[in-house]
C-alpha cells in the first residue's frame, strides 16, 4: 500500500489556508497547516512534509526567508510559493537565489496549482 504524500499548507489568512487545506485533502494528500513562517519551520522540522505550499507575505518570518531555512533543514522538500506577488518575486530573485521549486500566482487558480503539485511530487 502506498502512503499518501504529506503537504504542509502555510498561510496567515485563515480563509486562504482553509481553502488550500481542503483542496489538498480532497486530492488524498495528508494535509497539515501552519499560520506563519516560524510555525511552518517548526512543523516542517517535526512532520517532514513532501511539499510545502507557502504564502510569501506572512508575519514573523516571511515565505522567502522560510523557504531558504526549510531547504537547509530538509533539502528534498518541494516548496511552492503561492502568492499574489509573483512579478515582484521574479524581479527580485532571478532564477538563482530563490529557495523554491515553483512560484504560482494566487490569481492563476487551483488548476495550475494542482498541475504544479502533481508534477513536483512525481
Question: For each predicted feature, which ranges?
Answer:
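Alpha4 helix (beta4-alpha4-beta5 surface) of REC/receiver domains from two-component response regulators
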Residues: 65, 86-115
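Receiver (REC) domain active-site loop signature in two-component systems and cognate sites
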Residues: 58
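Two-component/phosphorelay signaling modules centered on CheY-like receiver
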Residues: 14-32
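Active-site beta3 strand of CheY-like receiver
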Residues: 47-53
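Conserved sequence signature across two-component system core domains
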Residues: 10-11, 34, 52
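Non-catalytic signal-transmission and effector/linker regions of two-component phosphorelay proteins
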Residues: 1-6, 110-122
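Acidic catalytic/metal-coordinating carboxylates
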Residues: 36-39, 62-66
